Amino acid sequence: VGNSGVSIATLDDMKELYAGFDLCAPSTSVSMTINGPAPTILAMYMNAAIDQQVANFVGVNGREPNEEEHAAIKSQTLASVRGTVQADILKEDQGQNTCIFSTEFSLKVMGDIQEYFTQHQVRNFYSVSISGYHIAEAGANPISQLAFTLSNGFTFVEAYLARGMAVDDFAHNLSFFFSNGMDPEYTVLGRVARRIWATAMRFRYGANERSQKLKYHIQTSGRSLHAQEMSFNDIRTTLQALIAVYDNCNSLHTNAYDEAITTPTEESVRRAMAIQLIINKEWGLAVNENSNQGSFIIEELTDLVEEAVLQEFEKISERGGVLGAMEVMYQRGKIQEESMDYEMKKHSGELPIIGVNTFLPKDQSEGVVEVELIRASDEEKHEQLDGLRDFQARGADRASAALTELQRVALNGENVFSALMECAKVCSLGQMTEALFEVGGQYRRNV
């Protein structure tokens, strides 16, 4: 069952999670932080949304839709759902080491998702969130975070183009996800990313204006949260949120102060949300976009960071591009070096961190706060397992054929996501994963 995130093993779990939410409402947008099994989880979500609209049809008409009506409901649902699935398998290898399928197979299925989105006019859902956040959390400095993330993004573009997709058919389905820390480079991270992306998309790929626009989400730095004097974490988060707003991020997540040690509480989440609300509704300067634009430090930093990122691109190219660099563990090695540098400076005091290595309370116990660690109970875990077994029993007569078809599609190089959309109706996450292991290969972790 696990302890991190929500346990979603079946379509029933997905429906229960979103019960009460209209998944096709313009005001509903769902972001799913899932990577290795992202295609399967995404298929469950899409089916949950379709089934929800079918249930609405039954409620209004008092009958099940016929085949033509069901097809229309499915088409309308896919065109309406809004959200993001993370799915970035490149950063998963570089920064987290938690892939489940082979990298090549994972890239192929990512392309299948985008191809399915293009064919079914899924225009409001991002097929991937190209993520630098995890790279930063693993230890990378802001330059490496931005360079690795953008190079990963261009790798996806090249992979999709190689499959025959037109750049303007998929570029709008790509989004980015960055961390904002305390270093000065974070102040211009968004504007540098947009400058590099727009230039490449226009002049290298011939993309239209919409495709040149880089859309990105910012989450304040989890690594900057400390267990010592946790109340100070809100101050750090506020500063990081402020520069994110000044840099015109498209969306923002502010961390709760107690995430340094546990799942946040209702109180800490409310405080984190208040940070955004106060900036947006009370802080006067926030009404103006690009408040810092034109200042010497912003313009200078923008040019310096862009040059540093382009130099990192050259180093990656010298190693055969992103995939070639991954084979020699270039990105992972650089992340480890920068993480070690950060930790050494933190422990030596060269990098001052208030309440951690300087400005310490006279009584060290003053900074210690008793916090309940939130974990799933054994009863909750057994309830989840019982639900899984019940779902598998109900679909047993159809699951075997669905899994066989899934493997056939994968072996023949057809669209795996299309098959997952059917398979998810009667098979669990584990069943589909095991079936794909046999034909797609299993990821072997590197140290």
Identify the role of each PLM range.
Residues V1-N180, E185-Y186, R204, K213-H217, ...:
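Catalytic alpha/beta active-site cores
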Residues G2-G5, G132, E137-G139, G164, ...:
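Glycine-centered flexibility sites
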Residues A9-D12, G36, T40, M44, ...:
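Conserved active-site and cofactor/substrate-binding residues in soluble primary-metabolism enzymes
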Residues A19-L23, I50-V54, G111-R123, S151-M165, ...:
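Generic secondary-structure signature for well-ordered alpha-helical cores
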Residues D22, T77, D88, S102, ...:
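Alpha-helix initiation/capping motif
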Residues S29-I34, A138-P142, S224-E229, A260-T262, ...:
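A short glycine/serine-rich beta->alpha loop
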Residues G62, A274-L277, K281-V447:
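Flexible, glycine-rich loop/tail regions that form catalytic "lids" or insertion modules at the edges
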Residues A147-F156, S175-G355:
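Active-site capping/gating regions of soluble enzymes
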